[in-house]
Design a protein with these regions (language model features):
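Active-site rim helix/loop that mediates acceptor-substrate recognition in acyltransferases
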Residues: 1-11
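OB-fold and OB-like single-stranded nucleic-acid-recognition modules
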Residues: 4-5, 15-16, 20, 43, ...
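Conserved beta-strand in the GNAT
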Residues: 13, 19-28, 32-35, 40
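A conserved beta-turn-beta hairpin within the catalytic core of GNAT-like acetyltransferases
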Residues: 28-36, 46, 68-70, 96
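Conserved acetyl-CoA-binding loop-helix of GNAT-fold acetyltransferases
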Residues: 41, 47-62
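C-terminal "cap" of GNAT-fold acetyltransferases
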Residues: 68-107
């Protein structure tokens, strides 16, 4: 786990009185592809703005690494039932008119 966090482009941790209550991180190439790999919030802190705060910080990071005319793709796969949260944060569901459904392979 520590190796994964160390190799992330950014890791954001939300605290309440020095207790970690949520975490999110981005992996990618640091230029055009950023992927929100994890967004985890302790259940008792869900629906209180913690996840949104973490997402906002991750989105800001991705915007800040954007090169002059290069589009940065910030991508994620959300847990089933969490689609509306990410739509409220500005993400677009796939598939859509521009993108296919995406694929995954577990190794």
């Amino acid at each position: 786990l520590q190796c994964a966090i160390n190799n992330s482009l950014i890791t954001v941790v939300a605290y309440d009185n020095h207790k970690p209550v949520g975490m999110g991180r981005i992996v990618g190439d640091g230029a055009v592809i950023c992927y929100i790999q994890d967004l985890i919030v302790i259940p008792s802190y869900q629906k209180k703005g913690v996840g949104r705060m973490i997402i906002d910080r991750l989105v800001k990071f991705a915007k800040d690494i954007k090169f002059q005319d290069t589009e940065v793709m910030l991508d994620l796969m959300c847990a089933k039932g969490r689609e509306e949260f990410y739509k409220k944060c500005g993400f677009t569901a796939r598939p859509n008119e521009k993108l296919g459904p995406g694929m995954i392979m577990y190794l």
